[in-house]
Amino acid sequence: MAARTVIIDHGSGFLKAGTAGWNEPQMVFPNIVNYLPCKENPGPSYARRRVSLGIDICHPDTFSYPIERGRILNWEGVQYLWSFVLENHRREQEVPPVIITETPLREPADRKKMLEILFELLHVPSVLLADQLQMSLYASGLLTGVVVDSGYGLTRVQPFHQGRPLPASGKTLEFAGQDLSAYLLKSLFKEDCDRRCLFQLETVAVTQMNKCYVPQNLGEALDFRERQQSALDESNTYQLPDGSRVELTPMQRVAPEMFFSPQVFEQPGPSIPRAIVESVESCEISLRPLLVSHVMACGGNTLYPGFTKRLFRELMGDHVSSTKATVWEGSNRNFSVWLGASVVAHLSTYQSEWMSREEYGEHMRM
């Protein structure tokens, strides 16, 4: 099924899509749609609005995230984004087979709705719905270990053995990249913060990408940054998109500490290291050393400088000092879900997991 298979990894923050077999997705864009006034039909009907991709600069208050915290909330937006991807991969009017990744948090009715959109509205010939965390595992080339995926909407921890999730061992933490963004937005702009202001959103994004890091010791890092500030260190300032300059506080620079000390940022716990330990401790004793020695870090938040080093130190120092911990970090770990699905597209052992349009029709008639 690998030939021309299109993979859509639709997360809370970004959609990553492309043809199986590539080293990375060819399309990566924010999980955002906006609704513009439809001048052709000004009446009181549904058609008064038109869906489009991203944030419209003339109507910045009309955008929506179709998926939030791993849950699909806007099916119209999801359909539009999937349609956009498939139109860009269509050849000679032929729609390709599709792998859609899905979160373990999906509602029972979500799978039915996903298949309905794909087969009845987008007319795909065959579909494979793939678990996101399992795909991250396959991207690493391993079958046993702990997948730690921290993205925009969720942070998830799941132990696997022989390619299968171990029952009742997974943990979902509802603090992730969007909470870090919200903290920076509020601390940078205070009472003027507006999550629909394009300038503020761009400022936060630039700050996260260029200035934030995970400290190895929060207290020491804050003391060091305080000394730098008193010395007017240029590394604490940067230029905003409008040309003005802002000086970052020490706490803003080390905001990714949130993943290791959530209580400092008034976020619910546990921390990521603690969640890993609790997940491993819920598994059979004989499996625990093997699991801890294969901790796979993936997702955009793991790209912050110092993240994997701090994770290793905490696993070794505070929680599992009796076991040799190893943190695996791939260079493309931001795309690990997509890359794992690309591997699955070539596996003959997964052929039985695919559903064809004919099988869908028979299932619906039952």
Swiss-Prot record:
An MF annotation (GO) of this entry: structural constituent of postsynaptic actin cytoskeleton
Gene3D superfamilies: 3.30.420.40, Actin, Chain A, domain 4 (3.90.640.10)
Major localization listed first in the record, in broad terms: cytoplasm
Subcellular location: Cytoplasm, Cytoskeleton
Keywords: Cytoplasm, Cytoskeleton
A single BP term in Gene Ontology: epithelial cell differentiation
GO cellular component: actin cytoskeleton; actin filament; axon; cytoplasm; membrane; NuA4 histone acetyltransferase complex; synapse
Domain of life: Eukaryota
InterPro entries: Actin, ATPase_NBD
SUPFAM superfamilies (UniProt xref): Actin-like ATPase domain (SSF53067)
Expression (tissue specificity): Strongly expressed in testis and pancreas. Weak expression in placenta.
UniProt similarity note: Belongs to the actin family.
Record-given protein name: Actin-like protein 8
Gene, per the UniProt record: ACTL8
